[in-house]
């Protein structure tokens, strides 16, 4: 199996465009973290392992908040992120009138919660 492409840059405009063009079998997963963040480093391998188990129907975006401060700031203003790490997913089968409201999300570094989050995604994405 080839290595899954994980994107490391995203803007609000690109996200809005992606959300408009997702088909019912697709989803976008966004992970916010930072190299200096201990909890982010704690879940890094768990996230990478889970990313690799999905088909290309799941678009994975792993954002360092220092390199993607603009979109991180947009989420902070909308009170969708109050700290990192934060993972959120948007399913193509759902309408996304408000780009900043994900269909599901998880915060923190608890491995069980992170794995449960990925298991919920598996119910929607093959």
Question: What do these predicted ranges mean?
Answer:
Residues 7-12, 32, 43-51, 55-72:
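Thiol-based oxidoreductase modules, predominantly thioredoxin-like and allied folds used
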Residues 33, 63-66, 90-92, 109:
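Structured beta-strand/turn binding interfaces of compact recognition modules in eukaryotic regulators
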Residues 70-83:
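Mid-chain, well-packed structural core segment of small domains
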Residues 38-39, 68-71, 96-97, 113-115:
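Eukaryotic short linear interaction motifs
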Residues 1-27, 111-126:
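N-terminal leader/targeting and pre-domain segments
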Residues 82-83, 88-126:
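Non-catalytic, surface beta->alpha helical segment in thiol-disulfide oxidoreductase systems
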Residues 28-31, 59-62, 86-90:
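Beta-strand cores of modular interaction/reader domains in eukaryotic scaffold and signaling proteins
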Residues 16-52:
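Local sequence-structure signature of Cys/Sec-based thiol-disulfide redox active-site neighborhoods
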């Amino acid at each position: 199996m080839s290595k899954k492409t994980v994107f490391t840059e995203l803007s609000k405009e690109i996200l809005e465009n992606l959300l408009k063009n997702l088909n019912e079998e697709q989803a976008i997963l966004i992970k916010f973290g930072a190299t200096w963040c201990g909890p982010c480093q704690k879940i890094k391998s768990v996230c990478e392992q889970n990313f690799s188990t999905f088909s290309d129907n799941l678009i994975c975006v792993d954002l360092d908040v220092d390199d993607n401060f603009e979109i991180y700031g947009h989420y902070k203003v909308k009170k969708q992120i109050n700290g990192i790490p934060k993972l959120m997913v948007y399913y193509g089968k759902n309408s996304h009138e408000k780009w900043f409201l994900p269909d599901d999300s998880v915060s923190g570094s608890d491995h069980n919660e992170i794995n449960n989050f990925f298991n919920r995604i598996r119910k929607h994405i093959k």
